[in-house]
Amino acid sequence: MDQRNKTLRDLPWEGERLSFFHDLVEYSFLRTAFVGGILVASLSGLVSPIVVFRRMEFIGDGTAHAVFAGLAAATLIGADHRLIAFATALLFAFAVSLFSRSRISESSAIGILLPFFMAVGVVLFSVSGRYQTDVMGYLFGDVLLVNSTDVAITAVVLALSVILTVVFRWDIKYFIVDEKMARFYGIKTDLIRFLITSFIAITVVTTVKVVGVILTGALLILPGLVSKIFGKSFWSLTTISVIFSTGVFFAGFLTAYTLDLPPGPVIVIIAFVSFLPMLKFS
C-alpha cells in the first residue's frame, strides 16, 4: 500500500505534461486544485493578521490538530468531513475557553487538549481501518482531496469573511488592540471573539486539505508576521498578508509541479524561506 505523500505526478494525467500554464488550461483537476489553493491562501491571509496581533497563534495550531479528530470521526461514520471538522474545531475552541475560566492558562489548556484530540483522531482512524490510506493526506495535505465542491464552499466562505470583516472592521480593530477598552466603549466583545474563533475554525478546515494538519499553522502565522513588519493600517495589514499568502501558494504550487514534490510542504518551505529576509526590516 502506497503510504507516501501525494505529489502532482499522482494526478490523473491523460497525456504528456508540457508546461505549467498549458496544463493549467488543459486539465480541469489541476485548475480545481490551483483555484482552491488560491482561495484558501486568500482566506488564511485575511485571518492571519488577526491571529498574530491577538497572539492566537497557539490556538490556531491547536485547532488544526483538533480538526484531525473530526476528520477521523467523519471517516469512521461516513459523514461530511467539512461539517464534522468544523464542529470539532468549535468544540476545541469552546473547551479551551472553558478550561481557561479556571486557574489553567489558555496555553496550558491548549497543551492539554491538543494531544488529546490528536490521540482520539489516531484511534478513530485505526478503528475505521483506513489509518494508512488517509492519515498522510490529512497530516501533510493532499491536492487530490480538493474538489469543485470545496472550491465553491471556500469561495462563499471567503466572500462572507470579507463582508463580515468590512462590517465589523472597527469592532475588530478595537478588540485586537485592547479587549477591555473595546468592552468599555460598548463593543460586543463576545460576538467579535465568536466571529474570530469561527474565522479561525473555518480557515483551518479549508486549509487542512491543501497543506495538512501539521503545516496549517504556518499559513495562519507567517502572512500575519509579514504584514506586521510592513503594514501601517488595518487594511494594509490585510492586503499585505493576502498578497504574501497567495504569492507563496503560487510559488509553492509551481515548484511542486516542476519538481514533482508534495505541494503542501513545498508551500510552507517557500513561505518560511521568503519570510527570513524580511526579518531585517522588523
Swiss-Prot record:
Major site of localization recorded for this protein: membrane
GO annotation, biological process: response to zinc ion; transmembrane transport
Keywords: Cell inner membrane, Cell membrane, Membrane, Transmembrane, Transmembrane helix, Transport
Residue spans crossing the bilayer: 33-53, 58-78, 79-99, 109-129, 148-168, 184-204, 210-230, 234-254, 259-279
Compartment(s) where it occurs, according to its Swiss-Prot or TrEMBL record: Cell inner membrane
GO cellular component annotations of the record: ATP-binding cassette (ABC) transporter complex; plasma membrane
Family of the protein in this entry: Belongs to the ABC-3 integral membrane protein family.
Its biological purpose: Part of an ATP-driven transport system TM_0123/TM_0124/TM_0125 for a metal.
Name of the featured protein: Probable metal transport system membrane protein TM_0125
